[in-house]
Amino acid sequence: MPSSVPKTSIESLGSPSSLSSSQASEPLCPLKHPSHRPPASTLSPNLTSSTESLGYLSSLSSSQPPEPLRPLECPSHKPCGRSLPRRRNPGWVSWSDSMQADSETDAIICPMCKAPERSCPHTWWVPSSPRVIRGVGRCSDPNLGLSWRQEAARAWCHCTSSQYPFKHPNLPTHLPKASF
């Protein structure tokens, strides 16, 4: 079975024991800043070009600090960056706050597009029970005192069951008390 890596490259590494040689290795030295020039003997045979390149590098490091970055100009008239919305997001508002009933027809108006329920493209907010639609925003509304979790549970219950309150045929209606 041929290998994609040539054998010679693997063999050239040697065994793990041969990697740690018995010879003392040279001590590691920290890297020096380009302005600290190494001795000319360690540069290269072409001393003038190496010295010139080091001089160029050191002049770069000692030159003036870079110009501060300027913000990009926005193509639109809106300000750059994110700003907080001025009003609440309708997705987080309770149904009783976000729905408006037209007093003449008792139709529900979408809080996003202000269209009637039947022509609204935002179907996520539309409740599925006529009981929730009637009397929205009035003191007798049973949904006014509910938390968003309770409202979500009630909405899920409306969506998954034709009966309200939710009664599953396989679950007992009264749970036995736990005895310890």
Swiss-Prot record:
Residues 9-25, 47-64 have a biased composition (Low complexity). It comes from the Eukaryota. Residues 1-93 are annotated as: Disordered. This is Putative uncharacterized protein FLJ35723. The lineage of its organism: Eukaryota, Metazoa, Chordata, Craniata, Vertebrata.
